[in-house]
Amino acid sequence: MKKIILGLFLMLGVVSFAAPSRINTAKIEQDGNMVIMDDSDVFAFGKLVDQSSVLAVTYYVGNKDVKILSEQIKNEQLVDGIDYVGSGESEAGYVHKLYAPKEGVYFYVVIAKRQKIQNYIITAILQTPEEYSSKSDLKAVIDLAIEEGEKYLK
């Protein structure tokens, strides 16, 4: 499990120091989440959803096009050993489904369409052995990721 968590966090990048002002970092840490990235325009944290699933939430700060960011994040995750399965969307966000056959885990990359706070885009990666295929399952993944991200905005 530790190897899976480490792999997910490494996919997200390097750690720096200067969180965006509208993110409640104290509450994130108080709730037992792990800060992954802390920069002036990107902040990310990770948490265990259950014994076999990890959620990493990232806030991108700035005036970015959500659809372009969605494709950009998806393409960044497509490395050797990761297969693109498909994508979908709901009113709340976009989701890209990827699979790592060697590890037997799925990655669901979620990007919120709407911003609770202007110029704060919520994205998330859910890593799980569970395959979610139905529209209602994918909508639940999108909702989980966005709700978790919005919970820590001031």
Residue ranges and their predicted role:
Residues 26-34, 124-154:
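Surface-exposed amphipathic alpha-helical segments
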Residues 29-39, 76-89:
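Short secondary-structure junctions
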Residues 26-68:
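Secretory pathway targeting signatures of secreted, lumenal, and periplasmic proteins
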Residues 78-117:
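Signature of long, low-cysteine stretches enriched in small and polar/charged residues
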Residues 29-31, 48-52, 90-93, 112-121:
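Short, solvent-exposed coil/turn segments at beta-strand boundaries
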Residues 4-14:
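Sec-dependent N-terminal signal peptides
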Residues 99-101, 112-119, 125-137:
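Short, exposed beta-strand-loop hairpins at the edges of beta-sheets
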Residues 18-26:
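Cleaved targeting-peptide boundary
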